[in-house]
């Protein structure tokens, strides 16, 4: 279902990124603020060049996207590994619940294997119960809990 994004996909991808960004701004106004361009075109084009931005289309219309990043982990006392981080995933809110996101995650998993990664990782806001449940249904496990405190 996923294909490498093209320059002409930017407006559709940016509109989808607004849907996700607005949720983040509502949950964490201390970090995010509302913007009409959460994915600037220059960054969009850079991610395409890096082969890290893919879109899902139905009948030629962009209905979702994924933004990826390859991570290499190593250090004293740790096993060296290459991971694919799912930085962002979005399915148009009007089309959620129809299996599109699940297929996108399956495609990202295949990309991770093709890139030689050992793991597919992501972060999700604790407030986003729907996304946590979705990711768990796709096979992700909760491995780390990040905490913060106001000072």
Predicted regions and their residues:
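Conserved active-site alpha-helix within GNAT-family acetyltransferase domains
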Residues: 102, 114, 126-144
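Conserved acetyl-CoA pyrophosphate-binding loop and the N-cap/start of the following alpha-helix
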Residues: 95, 99-107
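Conserved GNAT-fold acetyl-CoA-binding loop/helix
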Residues: 21-43
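A short beta-loop-alpha structural element at the N-terminal edge
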Residues: 1-16
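A short helix-loop-beta-strand connector motif used in the catalytic cores of GNAT acetyltransferases and
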Residues: 43-55, 85
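Conserved beta-strand-loop-alpha-helix junction that forms the acyl-donor binding cleft
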Residues: 107, 118-131, 148-151
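Conserved acetyl-CoA binding element of GNAT-fold acetyltransferases
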Residues: 79-93, 123, 145-148
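Conserved beta-strand in the GNAT
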Residues: 55, 61-70, 85, 90
């Amino acid at each position: 279902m996923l294909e490498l994004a093209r320059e002409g996909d930017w407006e559709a991808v940016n509109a989808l990124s607004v849907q996700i960004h607005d949720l983040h701004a509502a949950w964490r106004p201390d970090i995010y603020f509302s913007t009409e361009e959460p994915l600037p075109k220059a960054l969009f084009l850079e991610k395409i060049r890096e082969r890290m931005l893919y879109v899902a289309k139905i009948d030629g219309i962009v209905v979702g996207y994924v933004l990826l990043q390859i991570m290499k982990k190593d250090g004293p006392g740790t096993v060296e590994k290459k991971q694919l981080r799912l930085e962002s995933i979005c399915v148009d809110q009007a089309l959620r619940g129809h299996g599109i996101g699940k297929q996108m995650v399956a495609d990202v998993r295949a990309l991770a294997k093709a890139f030689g990664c050992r793991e597919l990782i992501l972060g999700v806001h604790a407030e986003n119960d729907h996304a946590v449940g979705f990711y768990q249904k796709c096979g992700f496990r909760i491995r780390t809990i990040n905490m913060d405190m106001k000072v």
